[in-house]
Structure formats: structure tokens, C-alpha cells
Amino acid sequence: EAAIGTDYYELLDRVEPNLVFVAGPDHLHAEQALSALDRGCHVLIEKPLATTVEDAHRLVEAQQRTGLQVMADHTARYLYPYHEMVLAARAGEIGQVFFTQGDYLHDMWAHYSPQGDRHTPWRIDSDNPQNILLGGGCHALDTMLWAINSPVEEVYGYSNKMSAPDFPADDCYILVLRFTNGVLGKIFVASGCS
């Protein structure tokens, strides 16, 4: 029988789990994961691991201090077409990969608008708005890293706030990447597509 509660920290203390899956609002991921690590739990974190570089460093330090496992859950890896594409690229079945492109284009108004059928207020909180690059564009980047199997050595990007004008943060991104093996990549992310 599953334990339930309305206070995350009280629930951790009461249940004393071995593993915690963090899948709440993006801006809470790091704090909830750190609390679980401090209580001796391994942690699986729905992407993104953190929304700031400082929080990402805190997670790495806590993992090293505790020796517990911390893992990002990139859900696109569970999708059969992605898996097959990556296997084919890595096996050379599609020839030598010299360029890769990944897009993450969504009409997020169902999530952003109070009238939306999937409205999630935390995504448009002006103090902690969801970063669509971290919250969605990471699928394209993770799939590229998985398929190309080479670190990124250089990246540049641009963003604007034009595709979803009422959203409180940038909503359109383009990144250009160079991998250490010479492969080039491009990622396009937008949250106001309809």
C-alpha cells in the first residue's frame, strides 16, 4: 500500500524510502533531490536535474558526499522510434553521421493558459517560469548526445520571446553545436507553435 501525504519532507521522514523519484515542478527538482539525498535515498530526477548551474553543482557535491546514485530521467529514451534511430546511427546503418538536427516544437497553451485543459500554474509563475529549453529542448539534446556518442565542444545559441507572448520567459531557442568528433548539430525549440 502506497503512503500518501501533502508534505514532501514529512513523507520522506515517515516512509524512509531507498529511492525517490522527483517529478514535480522543474524549479523544485534540485531542492527535493537534495533533501532525499540528505536522508540517505538514491534519486531519479525527471529532467531537468536543476534549473540553475548552482543547483546542479549542489547535486553533484551531494552525490559525491553521500555516495548515493543520482540519475536524470530523460523519458524520450523510452520511445521506440528514438531508440531504433540511435541504434542505427551508432551501428553505422545510416552511413556516417555528419549533421544532426532535433526540434522540440509545442503549443504549450494547454499548459500555460488558465483555460487550458492541462493548465499547470507553476509553468507560468513569474518568479520561476518553466524554461522550455530545459524542460523540453533537453529531449533533443539528450537524443543527440546518445546517438552521436561524443561530447559537445562548442555551442552557441539565441533566444527570443515571440512565439508565446504572454509567457513570462523566453519561448524560442536555437542552438548550434559542434561535437568533439566533428559532427555538427542544430536544436530548435519553441513553445508557442500551433
Where are the predicted features?
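Beta-loop-alpha module in the N-terminal Rossmann-like domain of NAD(P)-dependent dehydrogenases
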Residues: 2-62
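Predominantly a Rossmann-like dinucleotide-binding segment in NAD(P)-dependent oxidoreductases
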Residues: 76-167
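Rossmann-like NAD(P)(H) cofactor-binding subdomain of soluble oxidoreductases
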Residues: 28, 48, 71-78
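Rossmann-fold dehydrogenase core element
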Residues: 58-76, 96-99
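Short loop/edge segments at beta-strand edges and connector loops
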Residues: 6, 45, 72, 156-159, ...
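NAD(P)-dinucleotide binding in Rossmann-like oxidoreductases
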Residues: 165-170, 180-194
